[in-house]
Amino acid sequence: IEQNGTELKVSTEGFWYRTILWEVPIMALICELFYQETNQTRQEDEMVIQTVEDKISKYRNLNIVFAEFGTRRRHSFNVHDLVVRTLKEKGGGSFIGARNVHSAMRYKTRPIGTHAHEWFMFHAAKYGYKMANSVGLEHWTDVYRGDLGIALTDTYTTEVFFEQFDKKFAKLFDGVRHDSGDPLEFGDKTIAHYQKLGIN
């Protein structure tokens, strides 16, 4: 761990399959310590609950189902726990699960996840950037045989991903994951891509 002014650098060494597991707990810890050390006032529980309920209502009105993926950049364990609890209590059919296995177990919801960015980064290092998405998707389906079928789109930009996410992959995978950028713009691009492939 190194700190230079406000810049923090954390490194792990070892085999990839061992070091990758440090990403989530390290990022969650850094976020929680940041908020503690900078004395930033967090929203009261009632405001957190209201924010979550408002989002649930918006998604429900649009017939959108969603999963919770907030562990890495959460304010704190307590706030994150409150969010997942509220989603479970109020989410109904719109809330389909949580990425955090502990939260999923605690609130008896489905543990759900997608590829990590590192999956495609590994394939880029081994096969080259131009092949990273297509080879990564191919290897994923070889291993999981139809399970864990939500594809991550933004490792090397969504545009590049969709160039390689052809009809075969669009039918093999259950869906795609929005991870960065404007969600409405992403939704429009995704719908347009599926329509271009002749998939309704």
Where do the PLM segments sit?
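C-terminal active-site-proximal or functional interface alpha/beta core segments in diverse enzymes
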Residues: 200
